[in-house]
Each structure stands twice: as C-alpha cells, then as structure tokens.
C-alpha cells in the first residue's frame, strides 16, 4: 500500500514538475514572448489542419492561468507528427506559443494549415537530397519548427507580424507561399 501511494505521488510530482518547468521555462528563456503573451493571449487555443494527413484539430493547450494541458499537448504532437514516417515527437512548447502569438496578433481567427511540423531524421535526409531549402541540421528534427500558411492571410502579412515579435526564426518562402517559424535564435530569411 505504501509503495502504491509513493508511486502515485511520484507520478503526480513528475507531471506537476514538467508543467511547472514548461511554464517557468517560458518566462525565463523567452521573457519578451512571456510579456507579450501576458498582454495578448488570454488562453492558448489553436486550430490546425494538416495538409498531408487531412486531419483537423482545435485545441486549448494552455488555460488563462498559464497551465498546460498535457493531453492537449499530446494531441498537438500527433497532428504535427512526421507525415512521411508517422513518427510522433514532442514539440517544443515555445514553437507552439510562437504560433499562438502570431495567430492572435493577426486577429485570432483562421485555421493554421500545417505543411511540416516534426520531421524524422529519415525524412529530413530525404528532403536535403531533393531540395536546397531543406537543411541537414533542421529544427524540424528537434520538434522546434513549423511550416504553415493561414488561408485568407497573405504570407507576407504573417511574416511582418512574426518579425515584429523578434522571436525565433522567421522564414518566408514566396514561391511556395508559406511561412517557417521556429524557436531558435531570432533571424529571418
């Protein structure tokens, strides 16, 4: 009986610690985003469509108190999985928050059409062989990047908003008409 109680306490402690680190880590490692988020985002809600898997997800992954819903984060990981291999990885919450902040700054409406979230190393290597746009050490492989567009919103406008936030990588691909966001150092291309 004592072992079962200890195991339950350890599991609860682990879940609480992970959520706390995610929330605290956001404030420590992304102070600009955390300040902007406090002003702009009452709660974390996103609406996704994966163009490769034909799946949709509308999810509230963080409440107005800043607490993450671990089940919702799992759902986000699933829809942002590697469409080539089906491999699911843990997406960095910072890239999710970056997407949320950009979407809310644009008015908060509109389904985010995902072209690429997580990429397995196998799929990324294939893309590197096929294209000059893919890079060997992509943040997609780390679960720290998303390529997307929002129907009805010009990618140029999304880029402008993302650049004003001065957080992470912001890539604009005018020929393919999509945006890349990541949670690496601030840079643009």
Model regions: which residues?
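N-terminal secretory signal peptides
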Residues: 1-8
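Sec/Tat-exported extracytoplasmic proteins
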Residues: 102-106, 110, 122, 152, ...
């Amino acid at each position: 009986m004592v072992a079962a109680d200890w195991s339950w306490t350890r599991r609860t402690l682990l879940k609480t610690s992970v959520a706390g680190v995610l929330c605290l880590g956001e404030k420590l490692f992304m102070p600009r985003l955390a300040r902007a988020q406090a002003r702009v985002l009452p709660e974390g809600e996103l609406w996704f469509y994966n163009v490769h898997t034909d799946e949709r997800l509308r999810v509230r992954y963080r409440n107005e108190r800043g607490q993450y819903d671990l089940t919702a984060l799992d759902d986000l990981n699933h829809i942002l999985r590697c469409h080539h291999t089906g491999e699911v990885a843990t997406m960095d919450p910072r890239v999710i928050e970056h997407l949320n902040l950009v979407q809310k700054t644009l008015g908060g409406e509109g389904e985010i059409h995902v072209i690429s979230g997580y990429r397995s190393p196998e799929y990324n290597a294939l893309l590197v062989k096929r294209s000059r746009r893919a890079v060997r050490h992509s943040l997609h492989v780390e679960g720290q990047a998303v390529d997307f567009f929002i129907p009805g919103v010009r990618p140029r406008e999304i880029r402008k908003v993302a650049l004003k936030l001065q957080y992470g990588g912001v890539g604009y691909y005018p020929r393919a008409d999509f945006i890349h966001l990541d949670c690496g150092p601030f840079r643009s291309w």
